[in-house]
C-alpha cells in the first residue's frame, strides 16, 4: 500500500467585501495619489497597438520620481488556450479566444537592480512593484475623468487576523508515493541532461461556483482575477527555469462539478478524481489548480499532493481565494504547485535572501516571490529521482491554433528561435526582435549546435546510457541529436533480460523501483494469483474487464515482489493504486522465460513484441 502526502498551507484570511479594489475595504491606513504619465517610444505617426509589447510610465513615490518599465508577459497563455463555462441549463460552452494582445506585464523600476513589478494595464495600472526593498501596491482611483491612481505600501494594509497560522501535513492511505531522496553526486548522463533541459508546466485553472457568485456572476471579473494570479506566478517559476503557461480556464458558472466542501482533503480528492476522469479527456495539461471561494476548516488555505506532477490524479491542488490582494493568493497557488513539483515546507534554517520564502509552512503577511535553498534542493532531488516527463514537452508547432508570439520562449510556426524578450535574451544566435537566427547562424539550440553552427558529421552528441542504447552522433545538417538504440530482443543484463526500445526491463529492477532497494522478485507461486482475473491478478483489460492470465502467461500480469523490509515480511506483494491500476504490472518487453518476453499480457517469442 502506498502512502500519499497531502500538504496544506494556512494563512491569515482577508474576508471578501464585494469589491476587487482594496481601498474600498477601508483597510488602507495611508496612500499617495499619483498620476502615471505614459512615455511613448513609438515613432511619430506610427500606429499604436492597444497594448504595446513594452511600456514606460513615470510618476512620483514619496516625492521622488519613479520610472516603471513594463514588458508584456508573452508566455502567459499557451497557443491552444481555451475557456469553458456553463449555461444556466448546464450546457458546456468552450471558446478559444485570441489572447496575444492582452494587458498583463512584468517589469522593473529604473535604477533599482532589486526591483520587480507585476502589473495589469487593462484599465489603468493595477498590481504591485518592489522599490528600494519595499512592496508597494498600485490601483486606479474610481474618479470620473481622472488618471489618478493610489500607491500605498503593502505594510499599510491592515490585517484582519494577526494570529499566527500553522500549516498541517497529513497522511492518507490513498495518496501519491512519498518523495525518495536522491544522491546529488554521480548523476547519470541521462539525469544530467534531464536537469539541464527546459521545463514547461501547462497549467489549467478552475474557478468554482462560489467564486462565480463572489464576483457578481460576472465571467469577466472571475477571468480577470485568474489572469492576475497567473501573471504573478509565471516570474516566480521562471527563476527556477520552469515556464508556466496557462492552457485553459474553466468557470463552474451553473453548479459545481464536484462537492466543494470545507474539508480540504476531501475536496482535493474529489477534484483530483474529476481531473483524471473528466478534465484530462477534454483538455491536455500538466497541472490543475482549483480556486475556491469556500472557507476551509481551521486555518487551512490550500492543499496539494507532494510530488504529484504528471500523475493523472495527483497533479492537482486547491487554493482558497482568501485575500483581496491577488498576489497573496498567487503566492499560495505557487506554493501548492511547489508541492506538486516535489518541494516540502521550509525549515527554520532555509533561506532565500529574505524572509519568508514561497514554501514557508505558514505564510505571513510579508509577501515573498523567491524559493529557498531548501526548496531548490527538494525540487532537484525530486527531478533526479522521478524525471517526470510531461514537463519536458513544449507545445508542438503543429498544435498552434493562434498566431505565433515572438518572445514567449516557445519556437512556433514561422520562428527559427525564441529566446524571450530583447531585454532578457542572452542567446548570441537568436535575434529576439524577430525570432530569426542572426546572420551567419545555423542554429540556436540543440545537442548538435555549438556556437550557432551545426556540429560536424559523426560528432558524438549523446553517450550510450546502457547496453541497450547506442551512442548518438550528429549528421552535420541539423541541430537535433536523433536517438537510436540497439536492436530489440538482444540479450542484456547478463542474459536476464532482452533489449526493448533502448531499455533492458527486468522484474528485479521493477520491484526495486516500486518497493525499495531491498526488494526482490517473489517466488513463482505468487504469480499464480494472476490467474484469478481481479485487481490482485490479471494479464490485461478488455473493455475495462480484467482478463485472467493463461498458465503460461502468469509472469506477464501483475508483478509480485518481496519487499524484505522490517515492516513487511509478506512474500507476495503487489503495488496497487485504485486510481492508476496499470502501475505495478510487469512492463512490456520484460523477459518471462528463456527466449520469451511480455507483450500485451502474453509471454511470447522474443521477436514478437517488436
Curated annotation (Swiss-Prot):
Native organism is Crotalus adamanteus (Eastern diamondback rattlesnake)
> Entry cofactor note text?
Binds 1 zinc ion per subunit.
Q: Which residues bind Ca(2+) 1?
A: 286, 390
Which cysteines pair up through disulfides? They are: 310-390, 350-374, 352-357, 406-435, 417-430, 419-425, 429-452, 443-449, 448-474, 461-481, 468-499, 492-504, 511-561, 526-572, 539-549, 556-598, 592-603
Tissue pattern of expression reads: Expressed by the venom gland.
Location(s), subcellular = Secreted
Cofactor names: Zn(2+)
Q: Name one Pfam family in it.
A: Disintegrin
Give the location of motif D/ECD-tripeptide in residue numbers. 467-469
Q: Which residues form the propeptide?
A: 21-189
State any further remark: The disintegrin domain belongs to the long disintegrin subfamily.
Cleavable signal peptide: 1-20
User: Would you list which residues are glycosylated?
Assistant: 218
| Physiological role | Snake venom metalloproteinase that impairs hemostasis in the envenomed animal.
Give the protein name, as stated in the record: Zinc metalloproteinase-disintegrin-like 4a
Q: Where does Ca(2+) 2 bind?
A: 405, 408, 410, 412, 415, 418
Looking up Gene3D superfamilies in the UniProt record yields: Collagenase (Catalytic Domain) (3.40.390.10), Disintegrin domain (4.10.70.10)
Q: Where is the Disintegrin domain?
A: 403-488
> Can you tell me which residues bind Zn(2+)?
335, 339, 345
Q: Which residues form the active site?
A: 336
In its UniProt record, a GO molecular function of this protein is:
metal ion binding
Q: What GO terms describe the biological role, i.e. biological process, of this protein? A: proteolysis
Amino acid at each position: 500500500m502506498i502512502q500519499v502526502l497531502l500538504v496544506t498551507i494556512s494563512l491569515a484570511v482577508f474576508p471578501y467585501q464585494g469589491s476587487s479594489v482594496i481601498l474600498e475595504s477601508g483597510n488602507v491606513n495611508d496612500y499617495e495619489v499619483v498620476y502615471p504619465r505614459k512615455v511613448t517610444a513609438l515613432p511619430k505617426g506610427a500606429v499604436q497597438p492597444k497594448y504595446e509589447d513594452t511600456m514606460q510610465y513615470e510618476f512620483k513615490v514619496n516625492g521622488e520620481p519613479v520610472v516603471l518599465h513594463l514588458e508584456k508577459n508573452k508566455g502567459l497563455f499557451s497557443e491552444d488556450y481555451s475557456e469553458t463555462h456553463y449555461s444556466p441549463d448546464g450546457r458546456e460552452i468552450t471558446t478559444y479566444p485570441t489572447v496575444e494582445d492582452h494587458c498583463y506585464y512584468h517589469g522593473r523600476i529604473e535604477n533599482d537592480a532589486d526591483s520587480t513589478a507585476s502589473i495589469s494595464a487593462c484599465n489603468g495600472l493595477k498590481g504591485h512593484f518592489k522599490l528600494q526593498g519595499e512592496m508597494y501596491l498600485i490601483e486606479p482611483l474610481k474618479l470620473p475623468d481622472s488618471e489618478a491612481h493610489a500607491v500605498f505600501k503593502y505594510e499599510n494594509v491592515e490585517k484582519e487576523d494577526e494570529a499566527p497560522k500553522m500549516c498541517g501535513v497529513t497522511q492518507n492511505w490513498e495518496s501519491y508515493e512519498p518523495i525518495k531522496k536522491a544522491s546529488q553526486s554521480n548523476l547519470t548522463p541521462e539525469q544530467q541532461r534531464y536537469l539541464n533541459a527546459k521545463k514547461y508546466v501547462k497549467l489549467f485553472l478552475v474557478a468554482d461556483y462560489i467564486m462565480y457568485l463572489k464576483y457578481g456572476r460576472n465571467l469577466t471579473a472571475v477571468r480577470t482575477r485568474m489572469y492576475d494570479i497567473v501573471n504573478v506566478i509565471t516570474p516566480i517559476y521562471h527563476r527556477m527555469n520552469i515556464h508556466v503557461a496557462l492552457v485553459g480556464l474553466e468557470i463552474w458558472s451553473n453548479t459545481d462539478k464536484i462537492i466543494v466542501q470545507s474539508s480540504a482533503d476531501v475536496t482535493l480528492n474529489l477534484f483530483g478524481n474529476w481531473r483524471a476522469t473528466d478534465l484530462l479527456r477534454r483538455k491536455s495539461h500538466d497541472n490543475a489548480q482549483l480556486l475556491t471561494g469556500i472557507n476551509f476548516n481551521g486555518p487551512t488555505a490550500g492543499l496539494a499532493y507532494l510530488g504529484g506532477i504528471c500523475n493523472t490524479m495527483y497533479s492537482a491542488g486547491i487554493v482558497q481565494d482568501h485575500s483581496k490582494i491577488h498576489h497573496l493568493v498567487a503566492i499560495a497557488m505557487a506554493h501548492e504547485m511547489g508541492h506538486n513539483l516535489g518541494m516540502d515546507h521550509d525549515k527554520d534554517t532555509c533561506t532565500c535572501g529574505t524572509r519568508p520564502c514561497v514554501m514557508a509552512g505558514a505564510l505571513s503577511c510579508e509577501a515573498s516571490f523567491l524559493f529557498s535553498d531548501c526548496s531548490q534542493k527538494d525540487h532537484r532531488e525530486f527531478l533526479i529521482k522521478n524525471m517526470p516527463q510531461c514537463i519536458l514537452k513544449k507545445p508542438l508547432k503543429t498544435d498552434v491554433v493562434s498566431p505565433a508570439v515572438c518572445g514567449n520562449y516557445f519556437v512556433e510556426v514561422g520562428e527559427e528561435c525564441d529566446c524571450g524578450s530583447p531585454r532578457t535574451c542572452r542567446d548570441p544566435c537568436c535575434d529576439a526582435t524577430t525570432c530569426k537566427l542572426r546572420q551567419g547562424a545555423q542554429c540556436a539550440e540543440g545537442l548538435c549546435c555549438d556556437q550557432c553552427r551545426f556540429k560536424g558529421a559523426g560528432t558524438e552528441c549523446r553517450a550510450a546510457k546502457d547496453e541497450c542504447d547506442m551512442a548518438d552522433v550528429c549528421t552535420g545538417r541539423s541541430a537535433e541529436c536523433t536517438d537510436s538504440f540497439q536492436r530489440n530482443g538482444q540479450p542484456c543484463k547478463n542474459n536476464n533480460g532482452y533489449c526493448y526500445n533502448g531499455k533492458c526491463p527486468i522484474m528485479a529492477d521493477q520491484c526495486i523501483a516500486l518497493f525499495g532497494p531491498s526488494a526482490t522478485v517473489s517466488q513463482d507461486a505468487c504469480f499464480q494469483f494472476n490467474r484469478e482475473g481481479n485487481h490482485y491478478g490479471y494479464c490485461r483489460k478488455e473493455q475495462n474487464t480484467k482478463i485472467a492470465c493463461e498458465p503460461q502467461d502468469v509472469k506477464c500480469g501483475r508483478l509480485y515482489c518481496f519487499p524484505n523490509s522490517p515492516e513487511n515480511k509478506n512474500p507476495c506483494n503487489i503495488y496497487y493504486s485504485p486510481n492508476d491500476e496499470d502501475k505495478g504490472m510487469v512492463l512490456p518487453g520484460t523477459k518471462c522465460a528463456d527466449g520469451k518476453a511480455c507483450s500485451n499480457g502474453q509471454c511470447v517469442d522474443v521477436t514478437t513484441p517488436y
